[in-house]
Design a protein with these regions (language model features):
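Aromatic- and glycine-enriched glycan-recognition loops and surfaces
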Residues: 19-38, 59-83, 196, 402-406
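Carbohydrate-binding surfaces of carbohydrate-active enzymes
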Residues: 3-5, 37, 42, 66, ...
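Short, solvent-exposed turn/loop segments enriched in Gly/Ser/Thr/Pro and often Arg
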Residues: 12-14, 44-52, 91-98, 155-165, ...
């Protein structure tokens, strides 16, 4: 059962020391009334902010001078206790302006030639190195907070491995006799340092109460280093759609978090853009959608706000949050304490690729997830520790070469009847350029041409055969006798565009003959000879999406657990609530539109009509109804397939199948 409260607010309070009269307008009743209006059952309040200011009388840090002795944190905690609202405590770990002003030598330095780790556009905030004496100070601050307040949870912010070249890190490398010119030595040290930090801070958090929750926030849960997730007692998936994460980041993050066995929540914001935006509001419909989306993935919710320095709560903000959480309160019983169902497993490039990704927006992972979301597939995201049991198809997007360890694991999976879909260089050995599985093809190298063309044997969108341009890297394959089907062909252009030879505005047209197979099938699955996931992430090419979907459909056949005619901007989950003897299909739909300079906005929530759902369940279904209003839905069940039709819904619906 759930331990984390389900409707939380993360109340930022990063407040400059140059502002006076801090908390002067704090009013306990107004604070409580806003929490009630917001349907909030937990609020994270501040002990220490990024500026290094403490919001209670502290012996280990600098109390904000503008408080003039007022213990704001204690006042907030008392207000929460009186109305039964949970109140974990926030401590800024990686940023502390006050400390760095006094100890500039403790700054983290990202490159040998730089003087600090740059965090644009947050001018003024600079990371502190955990190999400096600051870590002792931070630990003492945490110990003071838990001894004084005994909170149920501690949120430690700006905490993830950061490569650092400060004098403390250089000294460690030197003492170990390692090469200071080798960047990998500093990468390895950053991971070791983060573990040291986590071990010490976790011990401090639990020094009073071993059941105190702790979360270290780094803005993303890393599948590259999955062990780090377990430094936390739970996961808070920071994902502000308008703050740089985008609307498709949270579903990707939640699908991965669900595999780790920890409770998790989705963290969005009430802001039009991102953290620290005073006076910024998104449309209420956007926040309703984000709460519904979060809960549909089995996640609790947290909404970010920032309190005014004077300590009063913004009434409009809590009216906005209340609209979203009123809906969340109504649907949470059908979403939380559930297990997600899957047909497809995606091996994460972030975890499996030889080279680590350069950002959290890895094109190979982003592209394949977009295709699967838009195709309404049930899928999970897998790191190196994940089991492959139970998946009907495993997808290896673009750059997952096969180590001996992975080969052994995949062989076992294939022996049990599974199928593979590989794109790009996935499926090739790490030791030499050859396929390690039977896709009915031999690998012959990377194409010399870009772009190239795919000529499919299927009819994309009902169009007749043609040669469709693909801009991502293409790979040359040759058909083998074991090939069971060539599903598409590859064609080259007359030449690559150069100053010496070019044609028209873009690129040369295709030659009138095939280079060879573009998609091949063998006994182990299918291979697509382009970085097709990256193609979809970068260009949004409809042919790329259609190619992956059509290939998947041939592999999975009639074995899909659920089929639904939801539009491509929708999200679908199927969750099992075993203790309540039911399955719940969650359908969520809105269409973000870019407004301004790339900001995605949700304004209108469009009503959808005649949504048909077919679910294959092993149990006999007794009843089907809407979770939002408990109204009955007519259904049929034949050969295990339960068929039901929604005449209409707006934004979200939970379709409940009682067994």
């Amino acid at each position: 059962m759930s331990v984390l409260p389900s409707r939380q607010v993360h109340l930022d309070f990063h407040t400059s020391e140059k502002i006076d009269n801090i908390g002067s307008k704090f009013d306990k009743k107004q604070f409580q009334d806003c929490l009630k209006k917001g349907h909030i059952n937990s609020i994270t309040v501040f002990a220490k902010c990024h500026h290094g200011m403490m919001y209670y009388p502290s012996k280990t840090g600098t109390m904000h001078p503008g408080l003039h002795g007022f213990d704001l944190l204690s006042a907030e905690l008392e207000a929460c206790r009186e109305i039964g609202v949970h109140a974990p405590i926030y401590i800024s770990a990686g940023f502390d302006v006050d400390y760095l002003t006094k100890h500039p030598e403790c700054r983290a330095i990202s490159k040998p030639e730089e003087t600090y780790v740059k965090y644009p556009p947050m001018d003024g905030f600079k990371l502190i190195c955990y190999n400096s004496p600051y870590l002792d100070v931070l630990v003492s601050q945490i110990e003071e907070v838990v001894q004084k307040f005994n909170p149920e949870g501690v949120f430690l912010d700006i905490s993830s491995p950061k490569v650092c070249y400060c004098r403390y890190c250089r000294k460690i490398i030197e003492q170990r006799g390692l090469d200071q010119s080798d960047p990998q030595n500093f990468v390895d040290l950053s991971i070791e340092t983060f573990k040291k930090y986590a071990d010490r801070t976790n011990a401090a958090v639990k020094s009073v109460n071993k059941n105190t929750r702790v979360f270290h926030n780094g803005g993303n849960i890393s599948a590259r280093r999955p062990k780090e997730a377990f430094y936390n007692t739970h996961l808070e998936l920071e994902s502000l759609p308008t703050g740089g994460w985008g609307y498709d980041h949270f579903p990707r993050s939640a699908r991965y978090a669900a595999t780790l066995g920890l409770e998790y929540l989705g963290m969005t914001g009430k802001f039009h853009t991102t953290w620290g935006e005073f006076g910024g509001f998104k449309h209420p419909n956007a926040l309703i959608y984000e709460v519904a989306l979060s809960m549909s993935f089995g996640a609790k919710c947290s909404i970010g706000d920032q309190m005014h320095p004077y300590g009063f709560m913004d009434e409009a903000t809590y009216s906005l949050i209340g609209k979203a959480y009123e809906y969340g309160e109504k649907i949470e019983e059908y979403c939380l304490d559930s297990v997600q169902m899957y047909d497809i497993g995606v091996l994460l490039s972030e975890s499996y690729a030889i080279e680590p990704p350069k950002s959290r927006l890895n094109n190979h992972d982003v592209g394949i997830c977009r295709v699967l979301n838009e195709g309404n597939y049930l899928y999970s995201l897998l790191d190196k520790n994940a089991s492959f049991d139970g998946f009907k198809v495993l997808v290896l997007p673009d750059d997952i070469r096969i180590t001996p360890e992975l080969k052994e694991k995949l062989d076992k999976y294939l022996k049990n009847g599974g199928k593979l879909l590989c794109t790009g260089k996935s499926g090739l050995s790490t030791e030499k350029d050859e396929f390690l599985f039977d896709f009915g093809a031999e690998y012959a190298g990377e194409s010399e041409y870009n772009p190239t063309y795919i000529r499919p044997e299927f009819s994309p969108f009902g169009l007749p055969s043609s040669s469709f341009v693909i801009y991502a890297k293409s790979y040359v394959i040759e058909k083998t006798p074991e090939c069971t089907e060539v599903f598409a062909h590859a064609r080259d252009p007359f030449f690559n565009r150069t100053p010496e030879h070019f044609c028209s505005h873009r690129h040369a047209p295709f030659v009138d003959y095939d280079r060879g197979p573009g998609i091949s099938f063998g006994k182990d699955g299918a291979y697509i000879a382009w970085d097709m996931a990256e193609e979809y992430a970068v260009t949004g090419c409809m042919i790329a999406k259609e190619t992956i979907i059509q290939t998947l459909e041939k592999l999975i056949g009639n074995d899909k657990t659920i089929s639904v005619n939801l539009p491509s901007a929708g999200f679908l989950t199927l969750n099992k609530q075993a203790e309540k003897s039911r399955y719940v299909a969650n359908l969520v739909y809105a269409s973000p539109i870019k407004r301004g300079n790339g900001v995605e906005v949700i304004e209108e929530l469009v009503e959808l009509h005649d949504i048909e759902i077919s679910v294959k369940l092993p149990e006999k279904v007794k009843r089907v109804y809407r979770g939002t209003d408990r109204s009955e839905l007519a259904f049929t069940q034949n050969d295990g397939a339960v068929n039901v039709k929604l005449d209409k819904f707006t934004c979200h619906e939970s379709v409940v199948f009682e067994i």
